[in-house]
């Protein structure tokens, strides 16, 4: 199913893009996704990939509990184009086919990132070659899934903590213009998809990184670059929930959309999960939350127990608290 039909169904069910905070008891909703849609959001999603979906019980659980999936690794540069011009899509195709079968929205993740970048890309020395590589890579990957992806994370983690640009091969050769090149290539290849810039540590209203994100997104959008949304990864520690909620409001004011894209909170504290959830609900254009994994067992931070469900798919106390908002 194309994402546009899923989007239409979500809008029909909710009646609005988003709504102010209202009380919806758990008795009215049976899953995180249905709860969030009852608040006018598009989805509560999760990260997954072929390797996790093939584990016993995981695929069925995700299809039941969540409304969106993000490929954790299978759409990254090293997975899709490990050698120049040699593309591999087996794992990404598996995820997309699964999502379409279960009517789940998809967030494509990610075209350009400083990590999981093939060595051959890092070794590029001239501008023209790099521009061609960026455009070819994005047009090929986005073009393959044209019309099937709700949103793409076009660039990922491009800022340092002090708000300066991360010194990657992209920035070193092309300056900030590489961002324009990437977004324009993505828009050309998949014109109906929402295009995002995604980053971590955007959780403090006073952080230099957050201020840089807002500054540059505002500048780029004013210049006509097709930057539609900001993704806040939201890998949090206990006690960060309230600040994160305030930061989401600031990010939402800078773009058409904002989304919490990789949520996990060390120890899964109830108060922080409530604060983050309310923060998204209260921001009209916060379209959804993606948990960075369906259960602790499959989390990149498994030992920190940061997710809403334990290894046996049992909901934690934070789930009940969220559903009672």
UniProtKB/Swiss-Prot annotation:
UniProt cross-references to InterPro entries, sorted A to Z: GH10, GH10_AS, GH10_dom, Glycoside_hydrolase_SF
- Show the GO cellular component annotation of the record: extracellular region
One Pfam annotation, family name?
Glyco_hydro_10
Recorded hits in SMART domains, A to Z, give: Glyco_10
One Gene Ontology molecular-function label? endo-1,4-beta-xylanase activity
Disulfide pairings = 280-286
Answer yes or no on keyword Hydrolase: yes
Does the record bear Transport in its keywords?
no
Which keywords describe this protein according to UniProt?
A: Carbohydrate metabolism, Disulfide bond, Glycoprotein, Glycosidase, Hydrolase, Polysaccharide degradation, Secreted, Signal, Xylan degradation
List GO BP terms, alphabetically. Answer: xylan catabolic process
Annotated compartments: Secreted
Inducing stimuli: Expressed throughout the entire infection process during in infection of rye tissue.
Associated pathway: Glycan degradation; xylan degradation
Per the UniProt entry, the Enzyme Commission number(s) are 3.2.1.8
Signal peptide boundaries = 1-18
Chain ranges of the GH10 domain:
26-325
Catalyses: Endohydrolysis of (1->4)-beta-D-xylosidic linkages in xylans
Question: Where do the record's glycosylation annotations fall on this chain?
Answer: 28
Active site per UniProt:
157 (proton donor), 262 (nucleophile)
Q: Which Gene3D superfamilies match?
A: Glycosidases (3.20.20.80)
Family as reported in the entry's similarity comment? Belongs to the glycosyl hydrolase 10 (cellulase F) family.
What is the documented function of this protein? Endo-1,4-beta-xylanase involved in the hydrolysis of xylan, a major structural heterogeneous polysaccharide found in plant biomass representing the second most abundant polysaccharide in the biosphere, after cellulose.
Name by which UniProt lists this protein: Endo-1,4-beta-xylanase 2
């Amino acid at each position: 199913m194309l994402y546009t039909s899923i989007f239409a169904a979500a809008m029909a069910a909710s009646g609005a893009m988003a709504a102010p905070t209202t009380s919806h008891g758990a008795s009215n909703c049976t899953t995180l996704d249905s709860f969030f849609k009852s608040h006018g959001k598009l989805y509560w999603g999760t990260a997954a990939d072929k390797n996790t979906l093939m584990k016993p019980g995981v695929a069925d659980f995700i299809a039941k509990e969540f409304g969106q999936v993000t490929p954790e690794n299978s759409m990254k540069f090293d997975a899709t184009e490990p050698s120049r011009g040699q593309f591999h899509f087996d794992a990404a195709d598996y995820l997309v086919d699964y999502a379409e079968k279960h009517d789940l929205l998809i967030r494509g993740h990610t075209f350009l990132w400083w990590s999981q970048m093939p060595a051959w890309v890092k070794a590029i020395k001239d501008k023209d070659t790099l521009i061609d590589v960026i455009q070819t890579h994005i047009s090929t990957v986005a073009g393959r899934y044209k019309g099937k992806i709700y949103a793409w994370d076009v660039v990922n983690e491009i800022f340092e903590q002090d708000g300066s640009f991360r010194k990657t091969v992209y920035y070193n050769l092309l300056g900030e213009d590489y961002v324009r090149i990437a977004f324009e290539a993505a828009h050309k290849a998949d014109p109906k998809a929402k295009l995002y810039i995604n980053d971590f540590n955007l959780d403090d209203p006073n952080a230099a990184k957050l201020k840089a994100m807002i500054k540059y997104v505002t500048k780029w959008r004013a210049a006509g670059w097709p930057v539609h949304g900001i993704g806040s990864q939201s890998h949090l520690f206990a006690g960060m929930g309230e600040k994160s909620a305030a930061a989401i409001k600031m990010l939402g004011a800078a773009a058409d959309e904002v989304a919490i894209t990789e949520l996990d909170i060390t120890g899964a504290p109830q108060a922080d999960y409530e604060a983050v959830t309310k923060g998204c609900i209260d921001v009209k254009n916060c379209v959804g939350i993606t948990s960075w994994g369906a259960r602790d067992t499959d989390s990149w931070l498994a030992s920190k127990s940061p997710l809403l469900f334990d290894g046996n798919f049992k909901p934690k106390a934070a789930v009940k608290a969220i559903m009672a908002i």
